[in-house]
Amino acid sequence: MQEKIIILDFGSQTTQLIGRRVRELDTYCEIVPYNKFPKGDETVKGVILSGSPFSVYDESAFKVDLSEIRGKYPILGICYGAQFMAYTNGGKVEPAGTREYGRAHLTSFCKDNVLFKGVREGTQVWMSHGDTITAIPENFKTIASTDKVAIAAYQVEGEQVWGVQFHPEVFHSEDGTQMLRNFVVDVCGCKQDWSPASFIESTVAELKAQLGDDKVVLGLSGGVDSSVAAVLLNRAIGKNLTCIFVDHGMLRKNEFKNVMHDYECLGLNVIGVDASEKFFSELEGVTEPERKRKIIGKGFIDVFDEEAHKLKDVKWLAQGTIYPDCIESLSITGTVIKSHHNVGGLPEKMNLKLCEPLRLLFKDEVRRVGRELGMPEHLITRHPFPGPGLAVRILGDITPEKVRILQDADDIFIQGLRDWGLYDQVWQAGVILLPVQSVGVMGDERTYERAVALRAVTSTDAMTADWAHLPYEFLGKVSNDIINKVKGVNRVTYDISSKPPATIEWE
């Protein structure tokens, strides 16, 4: 059985980041709601308590009885988690005189404490809290301080229980990964045996046992998640897997043909469906973004359902759902707040059992598994692309001509990123067709044509993103190529908005 660390989620925006950092230590972990600890699970080696947007003294704050956990497992409380343990054991937590957000330095810490093994003097940590621990219980010992925070970390004397006021999981905490390694490996004793190869071996065995000789259908999008899921399933059940790739007419230029070729080279059994006329007809005159998404979502379900029913004896629907989808689909109280983005509604409509072979993986782990499976690098490193495709990058109504313009402009931009060695430095990139026209001069003639916006961002998880600071020379070359080569465009802009407050996609 796979050993694991349990992360109790109290609602922090960085809880998933804790999970990713633990996984980077080649250790398996699971994120569960703060009140859903898996009692009786003998594979649990330690527990991490996340941060939270709440104050521990609020009536509405999330509270949990740790008596069955404390003493049985090592515990590390982060921010709210640290405050919660101090407060519920008789310590004091109060609003900070000055909220501390951003970089701080550990001015002193107990170098002989196992949590700080290998941590450098004055190391930078990341603070993000409005409350602070002002007094700790008698059996708690302060083990680190910053200039502004006297109790930056503590340990319960005689117990494997620690609390840190800062966020070791955040990139800006310079030795944060080392601290997590000290806890996960040295304290909890995890073996660090979680790897792409071990995941593939165990998952293929599980899929064979789960599916037997049953037939499975999977909807492909051309993206990383569904592609890796397909190759993994193909390794487990071979010809019993049938994949369906629907072209709604709003994919990137030549994408349907190129991706179908990739899938065939991977030995997948793929049915390609050109449903572009259906989608263009149903989208005619629609301008509201959410209506576009719903029309495309329903249309995909209808086409997929129709094609799947042509197959005989299918019992399972496979999806490329990944771990963040599963986490986001439940609130920390266990109620649904967001349905899976993959093929929402299909399992119920088709009366099929659901198979999600990647449901335990983060995005970066999906890519690592893809490499281990021998998939081509250009398929593994593809940028995220919205399910509705270019429909949400065309502001206003959608026509085949607008899609043609956007496909041509987007192709120049993306190929330019590849040619200049910039593609892998960017999390996501694309072109937006704006609902405006502008005056220009080409040759000796006045033009009145469309404007487009280039969008490229850097990110690690899409929760936050910064606009990519691409070279001016590159932007100038792309702008010139688009204006000269794409009929109908005479102006190019560059979107320099970050998320937040803007989103990555315009619609």
Curated annotation (Swiss-Prot):
Record's keyword annotation contains Acetylation: no
Pfam hit, one: NAD_synthase
A single GO cellular-component term on record: cytosol
Entry annotation: catalytic residues: C79, H167, E169
Taxonomic superkingdom: Bacteria
Disulfide bridges in this chain: none
Domain GMPS ATP-PPase: 194-382
All copies of domain Glutamine amidotransferase type-1, residue ranges: 4-193
Function: Catalyzes the synthesis of GMP from XMP.
Protein name: GMP synthase [glutamine-hydrolyzing]
Lineage summary: Bacteria, Pseudomonadati, Bacteroidota, Bacteroidia, Bacteroidales
Gene that this sequence comes from: guaA
